[in-house]
Design a protein with these regions (language model features):
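Glycine-rich, small/acidic residue-mixed loop/short-helix segments
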Residues: 99
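A hydrophobic membrane-anchoring alpha-helix module
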Residues: 188-198, 204-205
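Intrinsically disordered, low-complexity acidic Ser/Thr-rich regulatory segments
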Residues: 53-59, 121-130
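Oligomerization/assembly interface segments of phage tail-like spikes and tubes
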Residues: 79-96, 104-124, 142, 177-193
Length: 205
């Protein structure tokens, strides 16, 4: 398995097993007081693109989960490869917005294709700092899925070592990017693969 195949398959796995289970608010920085809309998080490999560079099938770069390869090693005698993975999670939540509902209502005029409403014709907004709860719930969902599975996308989760998680810091201070909320998770996976024999070894066979 090549590194590209590994990263692609891991991204697809998290998209199916994590992203499709969660919904978070779509960032509307220019109209925070409006009705909130919910979408499944997007999944990205290595980098989160800027808003003007997202793929056509992605509504917004956040909410999202980004699968990053931090380090790898080939264990030549054991004929397997180990990858150290970091997941970067991000959500947006400026506070309470009326109209948030997990029951979608079709709306062709909306870029998401649906809207979420509680029937309030006059959306209101109350700023708060509870968005951290969304990112912690996102982290918990990923942790749960990693605990439930031993093999993901053909890779064995190295459960002999802990899954680590936390928040980002800058200059020893918690990274404050309100109304955006971020967190990370690290873990390792392994997979076996055929290792090409050197000419010296082939001559001995």
């Amino acid at each position: 398995m090549t590194l590209v195949e590994s990263i692609d398959s891991l991204q697809a796995w998290f998209d199916e097993h994590v992203c499709q289970q969660a919904t978070f608010k779509v960032p509307t920085d220019n109209n925070i007081t409006g009705e909130a809309q919910l979408i499944h998080p997007a999944s990205f490999a290595l980098y989160v693109p800027a808003r003007d560079r997202i793929p056509p099938n992605v509504v917004a770069p956040i909410p999202s989960i980004c699968i990053q390869l931090m380090e790898g090693e080939d264990k030549l005698t054991e004929r397997n490869t180990r990858l150290n993975i970091r997941l970067c999670l991000a959500v947006w939540n400026p506070g309470d917005q009326t109209g948030v509902d997990f029951t979608p209502v079709p709306d062709p005029s909306n870029p998401v294709g649906v809207k979420y409403t509680q029937g309030d014709d006059k959306p209101t907004y109350t700023r708060n700092l509870d968005g951290w709860r969304d990112i912690m719930n996102f982290v918990d969902l990923v942790r749960l899925e990693l605990r439930k599975h031993d093999i993901i996308a053909g890779h064995r989760i190295v459960k002999e070592e802990p899954i680590k998680f936390g928040q980002f810091f800058q200059d020893d201070a918690l990274w404050d990017s309100y109304p955006y909320w971020h967190s990370w998770i690290t873990f390792s996976v392994e997979y076996g693969g055929m290792i090409a024999l050197s000419k010296e070894c082939e001559s001995l066979l």
